[in-house]
């Protein structure tokens, strides 16, 4: 059973009134949009409670389609009678001829990637991993029962709430499947498919062995380009005819091969994520995208020391055959039964009073004033920037190098 939400289900989302809100700062810029920390300057009841506003320009048919889908997913999560505490809700949304904008609760703890790298040794202890993975499992389980495959699980997309619990974010790459309770394989639509002939050509190029990955902490790259043919994407039409979605170090073998994929891709990504939390690096990272994909297809994850319940969980999640992967038959129920989660009260996860990390409150930033989001958007449109986009949701003030964890 999934944990009960800490508050009753919200009412249907409202229309976002950009005239009544001001942005306090930019939380992050990405390839598809900008995220602002904002507050309501009109309503006294909400002016002290900041929220995040994501603004996505309608620059292409692809961005328009993904923005609409993300808003739709958030809307479904918000009106769900069994709202999940580890998934966001849509506060309000707005559409203009130039852009989409929507508001979600602000997560003051930043993302899991920043938190992981701030640790002295760059890794989490087993108890901390258990805490975060348990909540992520519940979030994925909820999405899967709704018929949604997440398909973009990575530390950067796991936000830390003020309470210390997690929230998944960014649903533009998710996919609705037809049979939520008994997942079946499907063939991706033309935008997401890898040409099978090129996939076979790529398979002939890879060698049967892979070098040991001794690289340091990663900086993820989105695998939204064709790994076989490096031709530039045509953004004029908004179509990417030979592409697939995900982040290269987290992409599952069946996606690389161009096979149909289902909910099992999320359990594979959970295995990669858990490995990274344990060792500070992903298990298949290579010196290039091609080598990374070769490792995903051919290499087995390497573990230090003796096998234990945690490594058993990771091994089962990183089975390359999706039909034998942990979670492929009964979903999250199979994962919850493993010895690593022995003693976990799945229905009481939100009742843990002291999560491993509790963000410092930044109430000092919640002052009157701010800037107009629309004016900032117009400046971005008219002023080209040579600087690369900064990672989303990684505010530098969130946590410091020696922020301690509270074990539970």
Swiss-Prot record:
Question: Residue ranges of the Protein kinase domain?
Answer: 21-341
Its Enzyme Commission number? 2.7.11.1
Domain AGC-kinase C-terminal residues, every copy: 342-408
Any one GO MF term held by the record is: kinase activity
Any one cellular-component term (Gene Ontology): cytoplasm
Keyword Zinc in record: no
- Catalytic activity field: L-seryl-[protein] + ATP = O-phospho-L-seryl-[protein] + ADP + H(+); L-threonyl-[protein] + ATP = O-phospho-L-threonyl-[protein] + ADP + H(+)
Q: What happens when the gene is disrupted?
A: No visible phenotype under normal growth conditions, but the double mutants ucn-2 and ucnl-5 are embryonic lethal.
Q: Does the keyword Nucleotide-binding apply?
A: yes
Enumerate the Pfam families for this protein: Pkinase (PF00069)
Task: Give the residues annotated as active site.
Answer: 152 (proton acceptor)
Which enzyme class, named as a word? transferase
The protein's job, in short, is: Regulates planar ovule integument development.
**Sequence similarity:** Belongs to the protein kinase superfamily. AGC Ser/Thr protein kinase family.
Extract the PANTHER family matched here.
FLIPPASE KINASE 1-RELATED
Q: What is this protein called?
A: Serine/threonine-protein kinase UCNL
- Gene name in the database record: UCNL
